[in-house]
């Protein structure tokens, strides 16, 4: 599968900033986004992060450490400001986890960005970490997984996850977030599409053709 080159009506490649706050596979993300047709830059520069068509927030390591690094780089403020203006943001792996209310790792609790209610906790499975390829169950109307077969597999490497989704708008004028699930022992949230904010627990940049199509789908919405 070859990813199409997304561009606006003018043919300009979409500008995507991979936010460099010290906790993420920034080079892998840069290469994957470039292959998907984006004009990519790795930076923590405030103006560039704010003005890009899309902002990608990667994340590896401990929840609390990632939050500290993000705050030190003013990334928490940048994410909030972009979302307040309807500007697209995508989180990957721990970059998704920190979008929730809090994380608990080794009995250490840390506050997240609280864009979504929920707690990141240990995987409830016989084998931890969850490392390798797995399928997902995406909503039928998912934009993120558009064009992908139901048996498409994505690459995961994590020991913590969100096992319950509790956000409900109760407002018929507001679209409910699209939540995608995967299972390792117990079902967990594998991806979320919520207006301008999308995120995946797995690594699309390491997920071969399926990951390339997913990133293309995101870029085409920018």
Swiss-Prot record:
* Pathway membership, UniProt: Amino-acid biosynthesis; L-histidine biosynthesis; L-histidine from 5-phospho-alpha-D-ribose 1-diphosphate: step 5/9
Print the keywords alphabetically. Amino-acid biosynthesis, Cytoplasm, Glutamine amidotransferase, Histidine biosynthesis, Hydrolase, Lyase
Query: In what residue span(s) does the Glutamine amidotransferase type-1 domain sit?
Result: 15-222
| Residues annotated as transmembrane | none
E.C. no: 4.3.2.10, 3.5.1.2
What protein is this chain from? Imidazole glycerol phosphate synthase subunit HisH
PROSITE patterns xrefs? GATASE_TYPE_1 (PS51273)
Molecular function as annotated in GO = glutaminase activity; imidazoleglycerol-phosphate synthase activity; lyase activity
Which superkingdom, per the lineage? Bacteria
Q: One Pfam family from the UniProt entry? A: GATase
- Provide a GO biological process annotation: L-histidine biosynthetic process
Q: What does this protein do?
A: IGPS catalyzes the conversion of PRFAR and glutamine to IGP, AICAR and glutamate. The HisH subunit catalyzes the hydrolysis of glutamine to glutamate and ammonia as part of the synthesis of IGP and AICAR. The resulting ammonia molecule is channeled to the active site of HisF.
Q: Which residues form the active site?
A: 93, 203, 205
Alphabetized HAMAP family for the sequence: HisH (MF_00278)
Location in or out of the cell: Cytoplasm
Q: Please give the GO cellular component terms listed in this UniProt entry.
A: cytoplasm
Q: Oligomeric state and partners?
A: Heterodimer of HisH and HisF.
Q: What is its main location?
A: cytoplasm
Reactions the enzyme catalyzes:
5-[(5-phospho-1-deoxy-D-ribulos-1-ylimino)methylamino]-1-(5-phospho-beta-D-ribosyl)imidazole-4-carboxamide + L-glutamine = D-erythro-1-(imidazol-4-yl)glycerol 3-phosphate + 5-amino-1-(5-phospho-beta-D-ribosyl)imidazole-4-carboxamide + L-glutamate + H(+); L-glutamine + H2O = L-glutamate + NH4(+)
């Amino acid at each position: 599968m070859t990813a199409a080159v997304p561009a606006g009506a003018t043919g300009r490649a979409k500008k995507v900033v991979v936010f460099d706050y010290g906790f993420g596979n920034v080079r892998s993300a840069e290469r994957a986004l470039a292959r998907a047709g984006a004009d990519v830059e790795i930076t923590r520069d405030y103006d560039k992060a704010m003005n890009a068509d899309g902002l990608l927030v990667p994340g590896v390591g401990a929840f609390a450490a990632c939050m500290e690094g993000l705050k030190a780089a003013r990334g928490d403020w940048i994410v909030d400001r972009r979302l307040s203006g309807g500007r697209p943001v995508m989180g990957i792996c721990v970059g998704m986890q920190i979008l929730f209310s809090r994380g608990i790792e080794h009995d250490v609790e840390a506050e997240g960005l609280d864009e979504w209610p929920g707690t990141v906790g240990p995987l409830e499975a016989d084998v931890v970490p969850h490392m390798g390829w797995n399928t997902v169950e995406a909503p039928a109307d998912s934009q993120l997984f558009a064009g992908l077969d139901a048996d498409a597999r994505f690459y995961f490497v994590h020991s913590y996850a969100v096992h319950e989704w509790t956000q409900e708008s109760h407002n018929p004028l507001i679209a409910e977030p699209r939540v995608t699930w995967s299972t390792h022992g117990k079902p967990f949230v594998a991806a979320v599409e919520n207006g301008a904010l999308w995120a995946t627990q797995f690594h699309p940049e390491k997920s071969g053709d399926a990951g390339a199509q997913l990133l293309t789908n995101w870029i085409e919405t920018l």
